[in-house]
Amino acid sequence: MNPLVIKLGGVLLESDDAMKRLFEALVDYQKFYKRHVSVIHGGGRLIDNLMNKLSLPVKKKNGLRITPSEHINIITGALAGTANKTLLAWALKYNINAIGLCLADGGSVDVERLDENLGHVGKAIPGSPLFLKKLFKEGTIPIISSIGITKDGLLMNVNADLAATALATTLQANLILLSDISSILDGKGQRITEIDSIQAEKLIMQGIITNGMIVKVRAALEAARVLRRPVDIASWQNTEKLKLLFNGVNIGTRVYV
C-alpha cells in the first residue's frame, strides 16, 4: 500500500478535542494496518493570532500569506516551533513514535522563492524520499511543518497545502487534506462527493469556492495530476470515519484531475 500523507489545518491545531480524535484514530488505525504515515501541517490561525498580539499586519494575496523579512522569524517560530512541537507532544502522549521536522530536513522537500512581491513565501518542489523512508522503516511518523529553506539558506513560509502536495509527490503517497471543513460544498451548501478540474474551476468562477479554499482545491488538483491518483479533502470531526478515510474510503470530497 502506498504511504499516506495527512495534511492538518483549520482549527485542528488549536482544539484539544480535534487532537484527541485525530491521534485516537491514528492509534487505532496502526493497530490493524501497517501503512507508512506522514503528517504535515501549517498553522495559519496560530500565526494570525500571534501577529495580532504583536500588532503586526496580516496580508494575503490569492490565499497566500505575504511574509516580509521582518516576519519570517516569527512565523518560523510559530510553525516549526509551537505548532510542530504541540503535535509532537500529542503524538508522544498517545505513545506514537514520532519526530518533528521541517521541509528541509533530509532534503525531503526543496524550496525556492515563489514571488519577490510575497517576500519569504516559498514554492515547494519534491525532494528526496530517502530520509523519510528510513524513518518509516524504524516505525517513526514524521510530523513536518511547512517551513522550508532555500539552497542559499533563506527561511521560507510555504502554503501547507502546496507543501503537502510536494511531500506526497516525494513519497509517491496518497494525500488527505484534513481540516474543519468536511467537504467542498455546492451553491446550495450540499456536499460534493467528487469533483474534477473542470467542475472546480466553474465553482471558482461562480464565486462558490473562494479565498483559501481556492488554494486548497488547486493544490489537490495539482497533487491528483502529479500523483495520478485522487486526493481527499475531509474533516477530522468523526474518529470512526477518520479510520475509514485513512484506509481509502471517501468521507468528504474526492478530487480528480
From Swiss-Prot:
The record marks K7, K216 as: Transition state stabilizer. Substrate binds at G43, G44, R65, N157. ATP binds at D180, I181, S182, S183, I184, L185, I208, I209, T210. It catalyses: N-acetyl-L-glutamate + ATP = N-acetyl-L-glutamyl 5-phosphate + ADP. Belongs to the acetylglutamate kinase family. ArgB subfamily. Catalyzes the ATP-dependent phosphorylation of N-acetyl-L-glutamate. This is Acetylglutamate kinase.
